[in-house]
């Protein structure tokens, strides 16, 4: 560990002391350069002499030097304190193991005075000292560092660039990050927004849950009318990308969401770039639901139209890019967020279709449906073209744009039977992605199997499904889910041990979905599969008997 020399220098002879008032005064002309040369020479004489001693003598010498150092540090005059810091820097460079002893005996009041000084040299010295000691995690999490945070933030208001390395160091540990976040209200209300957001982002990212700190942040932005600023959007876009909804949202801030939503509405109306707005909107929708967030049906129609246009305008350039890492990453990210928003709104539309059909004018409702139909027609063309133009299918299947496109497309296909014939042209892709999900943890099986029962009612789609022997992937998935569920126990033992309060296991839900698809495909599947041992499990045996 390297301890900096604290920026002290030799100066002319002649020393005077300095009071606390002088140290903080605007008129203070006492600079670190005015340290006595005699004092500095004495320090070097002592340290040089110590370096020439043997191992035991070196230890004794360093301890003697340490005692001399702290005698000067706690002296009444400030000149002695400055000299002691020169000694301390030299001592810690030679003996870094003494850092904890030095921190325990540090003159904290003097350190605070340095941080609050009106002279840059003193502030620089104080920040350097604090940063050097905070390089040790145990010191970083100490009570004395916690007590310095208020002073550091006051210093940071005047010397932001000087203090930000210490802020970043504090933010590197969850405990010390909380020391900073204790002052969330002060930070968001007193600092320029860009600086406040940088401090808060650094500190928040050290934690797993940030609910506690969201309300004062919302209130501070509201108080200072900062909702429309680009830095505000960047802050929330980054925050929501980093944390899942449950990590930042609580009912306590529901009432504070409206100003942010109003700013999002304005962005959708006026801005060409929807990147930040879609990230924020998707998270607000997941947190509070469309009914609470959407100001009116007109805005919902606007959002669907703009997101659809954003996606359709970008898919062409992404056909080849999805097979090349890093290419058009920003565009892919925006497209994914647009799909995310559309998925949430499609669910809302499906769940409230009758009510919305009565509320929304027929021509606008038709316009909304046409917009989505055209989008997903283009989405299927994109998937077909991307598949045919990229040989590395595993990379393609793992690309965020493909994942988002398939997830939202399958949701839409559960409702729109007019596009089943076109969807039949993706049968090879669906089968591949379903199998791909087994080893890569992507929910393709879940998404495709939800849409499949509806699509199988279409003759064109059913024929394509039959031609690809796609029933095999459904049955293989059913067996795999059962194997995963059983582990070392029998399947029935697993079912009996499942706690209903914990909710249904996703693998069990998938197995049940596969079962119902197999029943629907009874005319396609070989009848011999119904004789497999899996159907002797009481759970499936009962289901099978009730369906035949």
From Swiss-Prot:
This protein's record includes keyword Repeat: no
Superkingdom field: Eukaryota
Residues with Phosphothreonine modification: 47
Pfam families: Neurochondrin (PF05536)
The entry's keywords: Phosphoprotein
Residues annotated with Phosphoserine modification: 19, 25
Cellular component GO terms held in the UniProt record: cell division site; mitotic spindle pole body; nucleus
PANTHER family for this protein: NEUROCHONDRIN
Protein name, entry field: Uncharacterized protein C16C4.02c
